[in-house]
Amino acid sequence: MPDYMFLLESRLSPEQRAVMLRVQELSAALGFNVYLTGGTVRDLVTGASLRDLDFTVEGNPSKIAHELEKGGARILSEDEKLRHVEVLFAGDCEGSISAARDDHYVRPGTRPEIRWSTIMEDLRRRDFSLNAIAISLNPASRGLLLDPTNGLSDIERAEVRALTIHSFTNQPVRLLRVLRFAARMGFKIEQRTQEWFDLAIERNLQQTITPEDAGGELRAVAREERPSVVLKAWEEHDLLEAVNPVLAKKHPAYDAIGRLMKVREDLFTAGFRPRLAAPMLLAVLGRLKDREQANVLSKAGFRSAESEAALGFEEESLEAQKELVGRKMNASVDAFRFLEKLPLDQIAYLMAESNKSAALSKIRAFLNKWRPVRNALPVVATELEALGMPRGTKFDQIVEQVFALQLTGRGKTREEREKILRKLSGIKEPPKKKEKEKKPAKGVDKAHAAAAMGDAAHKKHAAAEIEAMKHAAKGKPASPKPHAKHAAPASHGKSAASSKKSHARK
């Protein structure tokens, strides 16, 4: 048996792991048993990306949700009757917390009586076997897989199997849902389930789908990774009319959906995890007029605030584009700061639908050039600190100034950044040290002096030889000229000798 807890922890993002641990902690404090269920477990065993964290507790999930809210989570919607809470957890993770329950039908097709139950009863009352799997997060059974309907086998066979013959009768919206799961996962519908599906269509059960249930499926499609495949499957089975007759007549805007899906891939490549529900909803309804779009959302059970946000999304995005291409955004750093705060779904919408080259070039620069520079900014801070600048307000300002210069192409090398940092911080370069001349050793000094004396004697001897050769060439013996000091004594000696000879003759 695989170690599902190890698989889960190795596949979770750090933010998702923190959420899971916090929910475990709160559940234990309240005395609730807690389980990961539904899509989270299904995506885990199929190897798909874990988009949401779905928790089921044997207790009231509202208490946990409101405690999480204190730590930064946001409650998106809460159904008190079903005890189901949609949550945007801290760390920007989506998910839900539900109470374990059993739906008791007096007869097929009637409204169920809700009873709070154990996890096993909750799994057995679900729509399809691939959604009826759970992993325990409780201390005594942590990592234990619960699969009472043999959903793992159906996943291995790549089949979507309903759990009861009354599945579509009790909840006709499952006609849309079974096609959505099959299209999303590339699965086929199990044989008996297909027979029940065909029988339900023959009985026109699709016409009994409530607007609220249809709206729920419309929201789900907007969050799908392959929305076009799901919508086409609905159209092939004439089920799009159950969502809305006008949409069925005019058809979804598949070209707009395709553009948005391409943008979604680009954002994933750039390191984002975009939630594109609003722009995708507009893309699905793209062929409808504004009034028709509003009518579809109203009939689909969208709350007024939710509907206004969706219908006003395009206008808000175009206003943002107008500001982005304005004069105030000429500097790259100003455009970066603006785009950094702009909601990602608006950026995606502009990438898919804008025809303004100036806006698109700035968005591409933001995603592919400016953000990597921003992510490398801690290196600049480290370099400034190494120069001796203490951290503080001025320190942060200098780092931001360097970032602004880097967006213009300056400060690419470490040497260039150091010059910029010194100039901005006022830290001067240390004075260069002069190299002292090395004194030779005493023995070496004497050797040099002796060599110098030898050279002088050699030169003097060579000069004398040259002088002798010159005199020999003239026929005169070469005689060294006496020094002036010695001339007088020689002359005096000659006079004395002459005087002696003179006396002798006399």
PLM region spans:
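Catalytic cores of the polymerase beta-like nucleotidyltransferase superfamily
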Residues: M1-K506
